[in-house]
């Protein structure tokens, strides 16, 4: 994921973990392939001197704000909190007053147990469950804006890729698209199962995250980098049109859910 190139360029986080202007992850992929995002990504690769070819894929649901010792009810609850996240979200959460620590996934639970961190986010109910988040915290905050439209990429060595026959290059590209669809479908099934397990078996309390408007505070500073501003402008213009269509056209799914499963959501 380009989010982990953050130390090389903050622009990298815009390709998969950037701000939400109304678009979801699938619409972010539409920007990549039909809205000019891929051309900007290739420009980034050239600037960084990276000899790779990337196929963006696997749109993700909104990432949870994470695991806490007590529910987060307002921005003031984040002040001074030692919190694990990565990439552009690190700047976002620092703006909210947290003391951010960037750790790989395997170090998160031990760090919480030792008091190195007090709260953390990782990815989704399945990933969080797999490394034992529920064993060290019982408060799970969902519905955050910090990484709300994430997607992945499959990368190949550019020299090796370009040496392949065109039909073999196409096979890899279409395989990435097929894996993208299956990953999304499987994720919808598995994440929902594991969230129910966390609630019912591990006795984790699930909460909605109060929406915190830090993006507007950090973007102006980041946009002093002309290339960062160029990528944000492209994504924002595409989202303005595509998300408008989606939001104007989509039915109210929550209304239907509440009708058939009254009281389940609680908000």
Predicted regions and their residues:
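N-terminal secretory/targeting leader peptides
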Residues: 1-27, 43-267
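Signature of the catalytic double-stranded beta-helix
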Residues: 27-43
């Amino acid at each position: 994921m380009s989010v982990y190139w953050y130390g090389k360029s903050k622009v990298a986080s815009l390709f998969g973990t950037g701000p939400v202007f109304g678009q979801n992850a699938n619409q972010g992929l539409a920007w990549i392939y039909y809205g000019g995002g891929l051309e900007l990504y290739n420009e980034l690769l050239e600037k960084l001197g990276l000899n790779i070819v990337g196929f963006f894929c696997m749109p993700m649901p909104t990432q949870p704000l994470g695991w806490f010792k007590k529910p987060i009810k307002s921005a003031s609850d984040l002040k001074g909190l030692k919190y694990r996240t990565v990439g552009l979200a690190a700047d976002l959460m620092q703006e909210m007053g947290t003391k951010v620590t960037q750790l790989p996934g395997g170090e998160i639970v031990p760090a919480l147990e030792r008091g190195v961190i007090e709260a953390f986010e990782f990815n989704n109910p399945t990933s969080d469950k797999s490394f034992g988040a529920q064993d060290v915290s019982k408060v799970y905050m969902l519905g955050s804006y910090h990484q709300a439209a994430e997607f992945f990429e499959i990368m190949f060595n550019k020299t090796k890729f370009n040496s392949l026959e065109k039909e073999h290059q196409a096979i890899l590209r279409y395989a990435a698209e097929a894996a993208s669809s299956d990953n999304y479908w499987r994720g919808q099934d598995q994440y929902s199962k594991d969230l129910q397990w966390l609630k019912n078996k591990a006795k984790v309390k699930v909460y909605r995250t109060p929406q915190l408007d830090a993006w507007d505070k950090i973007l102006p500073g980041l946009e002093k980098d002309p290339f960062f501003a160029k990528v944000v402008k492209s994504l924002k213009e595409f989202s303005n049109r595509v998300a408008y269509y989606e939001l104007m056209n989509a039915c109210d799914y929550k209304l239907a859910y509440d009708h058939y499963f009254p009281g389940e959501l609680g908000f």
